[in-house]
Amino acid sequence: MPAVATFHLLRWQNTLGMVQALVFDRVRYRRTTGLQFLRVLGTGKGSSTAPGTEFGRTALFCLFDDEQSADAHIAQVARRNGLAESWHVKLRGAGGHGSWHGVQIPRIMHDASLPPAPGPMAFITRANIRARSWRAFSRDAAIIDRELHHSDGLLAVVGVGEAPILRLGTFSVWRDVAAMTTFAQRQPEHNRVVVRTRSERWYGEEMFARFTPYWSTGSWDGRNPLDAA
């Protein structure tokens, strides 16, 4: 049975709740039944994917052996004290490439028996950015962010990171895979930056992963973005 991923976006009632989550959640969840992989993440400001931090909000990305383990974890996270808002989604793997701290998430979640699913798609991009490339990355990330927010079919996006700098990524939800593909392949600034990241070797490690979101609950900035799909 293919692994099940979950993504959680958590807004806390105060900054203390955010700090406690970032400091202690790795320990809190490391013994969770069926958990294969966990990343506790800070988030960018609002829907911006450029470097920055929104105090009072965190995210989790998890990979589980099975559906039952994922469901139990979602229930546990949703009951956390101190939450002002939370959104939770279950994800099936739909391809991609690369790794996250050596773990090849797209390969682990690949299921050749499942045909490409119509409808909404979720995407995670993340990278370990080399220190020498940070200035160039920061400048171009702001340009790409503006281009991204003018893209047709984008339902929601948040910047995420394991640290405020150098280990950053995005989680986005799109109307369908065609909308994301149009952005990735036809936006001139995005294409220019992709070429530059490869030719100048900006990243020590990177991952691009596609997912089919098939269940969600809660709200993200007052709404469930999958309801708009």
Language-model features: locations:
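Glycine/small-residue-rich hydrophobic helix-like segments
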Residues: 168-195, 202
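Short proline/glycine-enriched turn/loop segments at secondary-structure junctions
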Residues: 50, 198-199
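Signature tryptophan residues that serve as conserved aromatic anchors
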Residues: 63-65, 174
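Short S/T/G/P-rich N-terminal loop/turn motif that feeds into the first structured element of a domain
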Residues: 1-58, 67-73, 82-163, 167, ...
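Catalytic-core segment of enzymes that process non-peptidic bonds
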Residues: 77
